[in-house]
């Protein structure tokens, strides 16, 4: 269970980073 939760957290962080990159690209 801990492994799945850790993987989900990592995926969430990656999604946030991609979202910020998209925002920066949209502003530029």
From Swiss-Prot:
Q: Which domain of life is it from?
A: Eukaryota
Main subcellular location: membrane
Q: Phenotype of the disruptant?
A: SclA and SclB double mutants show arrhythmic cardiac contractions and correspondingly, cardiac cells show irregular action potentials (APs), involving double and occasionally failed APs. Calcium transients in these mutants show higher amplitudes and steeper decay than those in wild type flies.
Keywords, comma-separated and alphabetical: Cell membrane, Membrane, Sarcoplasmic reticulum, Transmembrane, Transmembrane helix
Gene Ontology CC annotation, any one: sarcoplasmic reticulum membrane
Indicate whether Plastid appears among the record's keywords.
Answer: no
Identify its membrane topology class: Single-pass membrane protein
Q: Is Cell membrane set as a keyword in this record?
A: yes
Transmembrane annotation, as ranges: 7-27
Regarding tissue, the record states:
Strongly expressed in embryonic and larval somatic muscles and postembryonic heart.
Disulfide bond annotation, renumbered to this chain: none
Pfam families with a match to the protein in the record: Sarcolamban
Name the GO terms of the biological process aspect. Answer: regulation of cardiac muscle contraction
Q: Where in the cell is it found?
A: Sarcoplasmic reticulum membrane; Cell membrane, Sarcolemma, T-tubule
The function of this protein is:
Plays an essential role in the regulation of calcium transport at the sarcoplasmic reticulum (SR), which is secondarily required for regular muscle contraction.
Under the subunit heading, UniProt states: Interacts with SERCA.
Kindly give any further remark recorded in the entry: This protein is produced by a bicistronic gene which also produces the SclB protein from a non-overlapping reading frame.
The identity of this protein, by name, is Sarcolamban A
